[in-house]
């Protein structure tokens, strides 16, 4: 974007702010999902759309554009950093939850990895009561939004294989592989090692069956060598539309129509401008909250939508009694190990290995399935108690049973192992579990401070989650100690084989994981798309229960964790949600 367009962006934002205009649709948050919704709704020239975004337009920021310096923006001004204290399961450590503060949201600061997950996980959404939400339906929207750039022959030789039938070729979102993936030695040795461990190469991660080993695509433009975030993909082609405006500001709460009907009716949002002024913007039709899995529940609570017990403590009158708001927060549990290489590896290592429960637990799988099933009720009771009964034990147990079925009967992938070369002769091996039974929560910390949420991480709060992460860690260690991959490894520099030997006991693993496990920043579920009686916040039309015209579209509505990176599902969900909103026009 040139200087003129930058000034134009600021001018439009200023004018919209100064007038406190009214639009057909107003979207809180110009992030990954919000800009998808804005683009699709504004395709009709007679529909006016406004996006309120607190962050800047960073499309020309070299740090954002770069595909070589991943996570360089983690401590920058374009990154929200929300603190959280863990429980004794993780040694009461401080954790930081991060989200993008920019046009494009977290898609402007993340690792760009594009993995959708398993078919059965999406089909479970429909089993949970979300009519029409299943693998086939969401899959069609994945293809609608994607412009997949096929890899070169050189890239294919080092593992960048693909199945053209599972990708789109004319959507707005570029998806492909970096120009230089890795030299051949790493791919050949890693492929052979994983194949010897029963996890051989697959053609494509994104066809709904990701079990195995393969290079992972990323949301980037391989021809230009730049990141493809939602601002580039969805806002750039739409920014010249006169019916689409971006307003600089921070949404605080929904404004409501007077009256006490059965359904609450939103009239717009109240937001804070960069100057600190409190301004109201009107919505003729609907408001859409796309403020992230951290902030979307906060906006609802600040507006009187949530658990009356929590709202009362905050001094907020209850507008809609909806106890599920802010609950069911789920994240992946991630751990990293570092290896020194015997020779340097050039290029990007971007390979994912995704195992099932059988791959991870082996002969213990059946007995573990049985013992775990017996614990679901007690886990559900304990989790319900931590939220003072916000979601009933029976509702949680029903959701747990479906998750248990996915893990042990549907044979979904339950973990991911992802190596990255550090550029200084080292290799960072990250591994995480994808389907934890540990849930946390996110709520307002005070009535008027939406900037500092109260986050309860609650990671590794069930013994199964610890057992699962331990088993995945052992699988990771085994791979790097198995030929021919071990030929590339000089030693394990962190934690080191002295602290965590290859034959480490369960107790040694527990000590290591409790001191080192982190949140993977793949948060979903805090405004879950579920029936209200199951702890849901939005229905299958992404409309907030008890409201006539309030919708939520972002990672917060994904009802259960997926074996993928959250960004890809958010794009698919947002595309489908946009059509659900459009359907209400008829």
Positions of predicted regions on the chain:
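Surface-exposed beta-strand-to-loop junctions
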Residues: 96-104, 116-121, 164-174, 210-216, ...
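N-terminal glycine-rich phosphate/pyrophosphate-binding loop and immediately adjacent elements
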Residues: 16-145, 149-152, 321-322, 332, ...
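C-terminal structured subdomain/cap of oxidoreductase catalytic cores
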Residues: 19-53, 101-102, 106-107, 243-252, ...
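Short acidic, glycine-rich loop/turn motifs
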Residues: 84-91, 270-277, 355-357, 421, ...
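Short, glycine/acidic-rich hinge or "gate" loops at secondary-structure transitions
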Residues: 157, 486-498
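Conserved redox-cofactor binding core of oxidoreductases
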Residues: 126-257, 266
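Fungal secretory targeting signals
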Residues: 1-20, 288
């Amino acid at each position: 974007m040139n200087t003129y367009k930058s000034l134009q962006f600021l001018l439009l934002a200023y004018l919209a702010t100064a007038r406190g205009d009214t639009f057909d649709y107003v979207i809180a948050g110009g992030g990954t999902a919000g800009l998808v919704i804005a683009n699709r709704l504004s395709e009709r020239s007679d529909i006016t759309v406004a996006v309120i975004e607190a962050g800047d337009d960073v499309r020309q920021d070299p740090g954002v554009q770069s595909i070589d310096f991943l996570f360089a923006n983690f401590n920058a001004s374009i990154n929200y950093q929300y603190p959280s204290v863990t429980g004794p399961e993780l040694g009461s450590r401080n954790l930081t939850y991060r989200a993008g503060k920019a046009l494009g949201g977290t898609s402007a600061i993340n690792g760009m990895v594009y993995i959708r997950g398993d078919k059965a996980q999406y089909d479970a959404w429909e089993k949970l009561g979300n009519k029409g939400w299943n693998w086939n339906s969401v899959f069609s929207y994945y293809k609608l939004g994607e412009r997949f750039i096929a890899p070169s022959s050189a890239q294919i030789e080092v593992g960048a294989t693909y199945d053209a039938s599972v990708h789109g070729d004319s959507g707005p979102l570029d998806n492909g592989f970096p120009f230089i993936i890795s030299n051949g030695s790493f791919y050949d040795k890693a492929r052979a090692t994983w194949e010897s461990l029963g996890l051989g190469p697959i053609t494509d991660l994104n066809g709904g069956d990701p079990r195995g080993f393969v290079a992972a695509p990323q949301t980037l433009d391989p021809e230009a060598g730049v990141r493809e975030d939602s601002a580039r993909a969805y806002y750039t082609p739409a920014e010249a539309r006169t019916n689409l405006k971006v307003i600089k500001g921070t949404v605080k709460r929904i404004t409501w129509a007077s009256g006490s009907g059965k359904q609450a009716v939103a009239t717009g949002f109240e937001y804070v401008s960069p100057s600190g002024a409190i301004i109201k913007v009107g919505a003729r039709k609907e408001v859409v909250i796309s403020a992230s899995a951290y902030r979307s529940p906060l906006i609802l609570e600040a507006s009187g939508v949530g658990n009356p017990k929590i709202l009362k403590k905050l001094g907020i009158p209850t507008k809609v009694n909806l106890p599920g708001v802010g609950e069911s927060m789920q994240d992946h549990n991630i751990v990293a190990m570092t290896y020194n290489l015997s020779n340097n590896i050039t290029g990007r290592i971007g390979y994912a290995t995704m195992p099932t429960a059988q791959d991870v637990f082996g002969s213990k799988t059946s007995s573990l399935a049985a013992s775990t099933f017996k614990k679901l009720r007690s886990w559900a009771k304990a989790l319900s108690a931590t939220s003072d009964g916000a979601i009933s034990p029976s509702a949680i147990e029903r959701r747990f049973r479906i998750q248990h079925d996915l893990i042990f009967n549907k044979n979904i992938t339950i973990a991911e192992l992802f190596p990255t070369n550090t550029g200084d002769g080292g290799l960072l091996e990250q591994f995480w579990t994808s389907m934890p039974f540990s849930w946390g929560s996110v709520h307002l910390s005070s009535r008027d401070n939406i900037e500092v949420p109260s986050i309860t991480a609650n990671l590794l709060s069930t013994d199964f989650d610890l057992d699962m992460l331990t088993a995945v860690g052992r699988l990771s260690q085994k791979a790097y100690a198995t030929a021919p991959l071990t030929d590339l490894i000089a030693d394990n520099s962190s934690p080191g084989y002295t602290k965590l030997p290859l034959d480490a006991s369960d107790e040694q693993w527990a000590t290591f994981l409790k001191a080192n496990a982190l949140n993977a920043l793949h948060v979903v579920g805090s405004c879950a798309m579920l029936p209200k009686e199951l702890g849901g916040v939005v229905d299958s039309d992404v409309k907030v229960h008890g409201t006539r015209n309030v919708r939520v579209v972002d990672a917060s509505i994904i009802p259960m964790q997926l074996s993928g990176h959250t960004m890809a599902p958010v794009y698919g969900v947002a595309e489908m949600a946009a059509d659900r909103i459009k359907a209400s026009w008829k």
